[in-house]
Amino acid sequence: MPTTLNTATHAGAASSSDPLQILQQVFGYTAFRGEQAAVVQQVVDGGDALVLMPTGGGKSLCYQVPAIARHRAGQGVTLVVSPLIALMHDQVGALDEAGVVSAFLNSSLEGDEARRVERELMAGRLVLLYAAPERILTPRFLAMLDSLHERGLFSLLAIDEAHCVSQWGHDFREEYLGLSQLHERFPDVPRIALTATADDHTRGDIIARLALTEARLFISSFDRPNIRYTIVEKDEAKRQLLRFLRDEHEGDAGIVYCQSRKKVEDTASWLAGEGLNALPYHAGLDAAMRRRHQDRFLREEGVVMVATIAFGMGIDKPDVRFVAHLDLPKNIEGYYQETGRGGRDGQPADAWMAYGLADVVNQRRMIDESEAGEEFKRLQRGKLEALLALAEAHDCRRVRLLTYFGEHSQACGNCDNCLQPPAVWDATDAARKALSCIYRCHQASGFSFGSGHLIDVLRGKLTDKVAQRGHDKLTTFGIGADIAEQQWRGVLRQLVALGHVLVEGEYNTLALADSARAVLRGEVPVLLRVASEAPRKTSRSRGSRSGTGGGRDKPPSLPLDEAGLARFAALKTWRAEVARAHNLPAYVVFHDATLAQMAREAPNDLDSLGGISGVGAKKLEAYGQALLGVLAQD
């Protein structure tokens, strides 16, 4: 991976410091989107900014364009704080392709190469330098920044994944806490902090810990309209996942999240045995294997990465067509961040999750057993409750999700609940039976029991344990025989989610919450979702992806005729060859959307090719003639 690059530019790309001209000439886009223009101007003018923008919303341009503008104005280098080596590699590779002099400093560089990058930095030739916080805060690196600052060559500090500084957030990283030192040391250097998600607590923590009290706050819509949200009741979760992948995403790239390393290994192996191109990823694998698997995911088509949440942050792959969860995340922020890794190219993607009572039990137990203070536990319980409300919702998932982030919207018409509203039943009587059973079993034995035993009592199943405890003599024995075991599991799960039942101790026993009294007295009605016995069919206004090869050869955006499809296929073949030669993911060369526009419009000269969105001056110079040759083929 090159860390610095040729500074030659296309004749049309004058060294303008105007942000819009930079956007057009360097990156090949005609206009800024949403809040981008206001953010860029704030930073170009030397102000601080805190940017909350969803994944795929164009956060990188919010600091890359100002970095180029300020460098061209003689103000020096932009330092980008990034937590992941993979992200640094891909960002520098993409900037290289666009003709922007940039580099990274991390443990992947040999000593000679690292020293060469440092010389480029100190000479003022770099526009952007990417580094991790732990490297930036070393005495050696701070001394280099001191030297740059004294010469007026420390232009801007960009802090990516800023939520990592917050202990209230879903991905706290202790090394981020030291970044406030940079503002104390260089108070006149403007800063931009960026994150894809942050609730009020996390947002306040970012502002406090990074001393961004004077920063202008930019909040874009959290809506990802191209993502369809589906949450199903767990029943043989791996089989449910396989059915989802085969029915909807055969041949597509995607991510499957699991909570434990063992489950990652087991699921990846099982999916591979079922014929899918599935790979495991978790922190327990050695670094070389993690890097190999990540590179395959980024560079190959149709790879399914089965991973813990150690995977995903900073992954810029635009054509991830699905994100699946086999376990419940910790909170809505984590769910939003993880599902947001799908559909970065703006094309349709699925967020699919299987969820059951054991998920609720496990998450509650982890909170209760953590060594955190009671205030932190209380906040985490509240966040989990919000996620459970989303999982059990009868109405639009998107409305629920956006409401959590303080944004109001209309029903999307595209989530599972909108496409097929769930059946709801009056479960007041069943809930009272379940709560009474929990109470009677505890009263008889002096301690609580788990869901399996309680269901046996409710259904009148005389197991050894039921007989030993004398629970077959209770008035609640057999009072729920008319309800199937799976439905009782749904009742108990939803009572836990509603807060009427508590999960206690290392054995995950169930106990009554204070709110259960009102239900038992018949003062509060209980409406629950009907337990699903078969996969719910949902129709797509956007069309199915089923069938061999799935969506991998399907061009995005507007449909192409037969000739256009042939051009698109030829362009993808050409792009793959270039990507291999440059050791880059294919999307760094050109996104699918750019190739699709080329295939549709079939430009026959450099000027018209340069008008395609995503074709900047450097790429036009480097690839223009070759692309025209591909497009001219019959």
Descriptions of predicted regions:
Residues 375-405:
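Short, charged low-complexity linear segments at domain edges
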Residues 1-22, 42, 380-381, 408-634:
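Accessory DNA-binding and partner-docking regions appended to nucleic-acid-acting proteins
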Residues 40, 64, 305-307, 311, ...:
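Alpha-helical structural signal
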Residues 10-26, 30-34, 38-50, 54-60, ...:
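Helicase motor core with emphasis on the C-terminal RecA-like subdomain
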Residues 116, 205, 266, 292, ...:
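Short, solvent-exposed alpha-helical surface patches in well-structured domains
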